[in-house]
């Protein structure tokens, strides 16, 4: 018996068996793979369908004897049945859109799949040549918005003389086919993908010596690599609490895994290194711990500024910055510029605005205060910032950021004999407010307040959610990865900029001269200009003249292209993905503590220029 092969219609609607273009009423569309078939070329056995939607011979899984070779495998054991089952599973997935279902069906029909494609390959598949289905080499973008390799495009348009896009069948202008232009924005995207992969492999091969928290000693330690004696180059000891670095308020017993009592008011430590091991104040040099976009979690009173006034239950605190720390200086008592509400100062102002509790530690270095401990560092409870302002400091030259802290803790202060904690108290009079500028007073209800019914301080609003990973090694790994990729992503977004508005492309269109513009910007550039200009003057009628619409970047005429400019969808998806990753990176970056953390794996061996956020410490041992 002769084998009768059944074939569907191609992309142009031509039957692949009889080479005739049938009318729509003489075609059947498969309900599974959405492929048109010529009814006259189908065998009668294939036209019978037991379900409501007709299925083509390829999807039905039923092999017609007259249409199959004698050695074929039929029935549900055939590979076609597996393919049909996979397609039906895609169709039944309610979480997918119609476009996503179509992509998955096409990938299955072409012999590909998701399981064998890793994340890097998936990223590359966002940009591919529509002919060779590979990363385009010297990419060319047609006016219809599809991308090709330069060689593939020349072979298609010049070698074979086909002036229609193989994807959408749109007409390709002759001047584009004759002189295609390389899309430099796509070149940058492909280069970034390749460089990112290479840098990722190189980073993975690098060995990092990491000491996990459970393997650390109980106290700060040094190694033979330490340049200075004492604790100047010491690494941190073991952390005894499980709070993240952006934790607000007291440290509860649930986070004290060793004692199950939390950190109590009045606890003291030998130095700032031990203090940070209990999570009360993490920076071992800087006086403010916080993030400008999140708030300040803790401050240290250690005599860094002569402007500070300590009255126990309330104190006036001075912000950071305004001092020259160049030349590897750690401390400079001379104020050389004005302080501004940014970085750590902005973090304190945000805590004032939101009414967050701020942990306060006092150091023995504060010699002018009657409430400072005689030795070491002591935790004195949580305070709330009620006001902040700017005023000229005691040196009389530059403005300082000033803050009014008022105690609001459920435990009594270490210098009192009370058995209960604080109660709401009136704000003290501050004489320097008469000459203050940039005064800010919180008007809305604070997040940390006093509950009259329960008689204690508590969170009146939900506390801020932590944005930082608890695991130190995981945090450092993410930091290294973001540091390597942020510069490349910023460069890529710069490459994907509109040549008119100079912003990141929105609905990008690629002109025949390979320049990229926002669709709205390009249309607005030529708004009100018609394709033809009427030259009749009332006396005699002349032929209409074509208006030349010159590209904003070159002398190419875009009049034909502007009749129906098509958005480059692949480029738009790439831009959206990178913008999303940039936003995630910015959110993660804003949650990082701005003070530089010491290298917890090994002590540093080179000099480090301290940031102006360092306040008042003359040694690491507080």
Swiss-Prot record:
One of its GO terms (biological process) is chromatin organization. GO terms for cellular component: nucleus. It is found in: Nucleus. A zinc finger (PHD-type) spans 12-62. Residues 566-602 form a coiled coil. GO terms for molecular function: histone binding; methyl-CpG binding; methyl-CpNpG binding; methyl-CpNpN binding; ubiquitin-protein transferase activity; zinc ion binding. Residues 611-622 have a biased composition (Polar residues). InterPro entries: PUA-like_sf, RING-HC_ORTHRUS_rpt1, RING-HC_ORTHRUS_rpt2, SRA-YDG_sf, SRA_YDG, UHRF1/2-like, Zinc_finger_PHD-type_CS, Znf-RING_euk. E3 ubiquitin-protein ligase. May participate in CpG methylation-dependent transcriptional regulation. This is Putative E3 ubiquitin-protein ligase ORTHRUS 4.
């Amino acid at each position: 018996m002769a084998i009768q092969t059944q074939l569907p219609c191609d992309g142009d609607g031509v039957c692949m068996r009889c080479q005739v273009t049938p009318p729509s009423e003489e075609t059947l569309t498969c309900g599974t793979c959405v492929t048109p078939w010529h009814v006259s070329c189908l065998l009668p056995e294939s036209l019978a369908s037991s379900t409501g939607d007709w299925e083509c011979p390829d999807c039905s899984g039923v092999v017609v004897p007259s249409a199959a070779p004698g050695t074929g495998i039929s029935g549900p054991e055939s590979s076609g049945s597996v393919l049909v089952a996979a397609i039906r599973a895609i169709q039944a997935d309610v979480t997918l859109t119609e476009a996503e279902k179509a992509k998955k069906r096409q990938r299955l029909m072409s012999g590909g799949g998701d399981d064998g494609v890793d994340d890097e390959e998936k990223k590359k598949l966002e940009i591919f040549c529509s002919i060779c289905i590979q990363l385009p080499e010297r990419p060319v973008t047609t006016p219809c918005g599809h991308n090709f390799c330069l060689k593939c495009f020349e072979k298609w348009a010049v070698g074979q003389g086909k002036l229609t896009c193989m994807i959408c069948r749109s007409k390709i202008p002759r001047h584009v086919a004759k002189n295609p232009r390389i899309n430099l924005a796509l070149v940058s995207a492909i280069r970034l993908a390749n460089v990112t992969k290479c840098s990722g492999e190189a980073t993975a091969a690098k060995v990092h010596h990491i000491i996990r928290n459970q393997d650390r000693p109980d106290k700060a330690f040094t190694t033979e690599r330490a340049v200075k004696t004492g604790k100047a180059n010491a690494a941190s000891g073991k952390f005894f609490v499980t709070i993240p670095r952006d934790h607000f308020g007291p440290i509860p017993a649930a986070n004290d895994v060793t004692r199950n009592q939390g950190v109590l008011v009045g606890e003291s430590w030998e130095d700032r290194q031990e203090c940070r091991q209990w999570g009360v104040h993490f920076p071992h040099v800087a006086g403010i711990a916080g993030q400008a976009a999140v708030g300040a979690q803790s401050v240290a009173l250690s005599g860094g500024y002569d402007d500070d006034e300590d009255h126990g239950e309330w104190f006036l605190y001075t912000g950071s910055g305004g001092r020259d720390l160049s030349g590897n200086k750690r401390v400079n008592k001379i104020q050389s510029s004005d302080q501004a509400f940014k970085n750590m100062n902005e973090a304190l102002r945000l805590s004032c605005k939101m009414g967050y509790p701020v942990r306060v530690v006092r150091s023995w270095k504060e010699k002018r205060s009657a409430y400072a401990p005689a030795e070491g560092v002591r935790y004195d409870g949580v305070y709330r910032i009620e006001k902040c302002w700017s005023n000229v400091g005691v040196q009389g030259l530059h403005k300082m950021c000033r803050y009014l802290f008022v105690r609001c803790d459920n435990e009594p202060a270490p210098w009192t004999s009370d058995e209960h904690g604080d109660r709401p108290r009136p704000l003290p009079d501050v004489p320097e407010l008469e000459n203050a500028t940039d005064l800010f007073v919180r008007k809305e209800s604070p997040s940390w307040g006093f509950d009259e019914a329960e008689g204690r301080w508590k969170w009146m609003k939900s506390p801020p959610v932590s944005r930082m990973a608890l695991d130190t090694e995981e945090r450092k790994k993410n930091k290294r990865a973001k540091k390597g990729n942020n510069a490349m992503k910023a460069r890529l977004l710069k490459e994907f900029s509109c040549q008119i508005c100079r912003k990141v492309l929105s609905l990008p269109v690629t002109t025949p001269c390979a320049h990229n513009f926002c669709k709205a910007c390009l249309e607005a550039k030529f708004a009100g200009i018609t394709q033809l200009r009427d030259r009749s003057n009332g006396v005699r009628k002349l032929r209409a003249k074509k208006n030349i619409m010159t590209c904003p970047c070159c002398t190419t005429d875009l009049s034909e292209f502007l009749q129906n400019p098509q958005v480059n969808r692949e480029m738009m998806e790439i831009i959206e993905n990178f913008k999303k990753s940039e936003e995630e990176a910015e959110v993660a970056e804003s949650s990082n503590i701005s003070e530089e953390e010491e290298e917890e794996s090994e002590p540093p061996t080179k000099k480090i220029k301290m940031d102006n956020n360092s306040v008042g410490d003359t040694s690491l041992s507080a």
